[in-house]
Amino acid sequence: RYGSSAASDVYKRQIIKLLMKSKEAVLLVNLGSPKKLDKKSVREYLDVFLSDDYVVDIPKFLQQLILKLFILPFRPKQTLHAYEQIWTNAGSPLIISTLNIKNKLIKKTGWHVEIAMRYEDPSIELALNNLKLNGFNKIYVVPLYPHNAMATTITTKVEVERLANEVFPDAELNFIKPFYKNEKYIKAISKGVREYLLEHNFDKLIFSY
């Protein structure tokens, strides 16, 4: 007589959304890192990362065949050695630097800021749940990559949207566009490079992408 329970739930959500004052927050998303500095954690990270179709864009069967037979049995040891050169006492340098960005952004703006990694922890799902529990319904998602690419911004956007549909369907997502041409970003990078070069004696500066 009065419609299905599912329809009723939809109407309730719409009414709540209209009545709810918009609360804004920022979600910073970076690539990710192994959970620990050991071979098992590195292997798990590589497995998740290289299983992403936006990173390795080949037929799934071939992707997994190469990954399971030729990469995961050998690559974790080499990758672990590379991580050992940069790992800190506080943990992953990527997660630490992302936390630093979060804290500086909070200090400068007073905004509520969550961080997440596209692969491994802290997860996007956890961040979205935290935002939901704290009543933030308008979210500015900032993929921390200046450029646009399938393996960075695109996969991040797809995953955030997928998880938001599952755990936070009422969220309004606003994705910040790639900022590689932003004048302030370019000046900040240039300033950092110049200051570093003044402190260190190098013969050449090489840019690699």
Residue map of PLM features:
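Active-site-proximal alpha-helix that buttresses catalytic centers in soluble enzyme cores
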Residues: 19-209
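Single conserved hydrophobic/aromatic residue that forms the stacking wall/gate
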Residues: 1-14
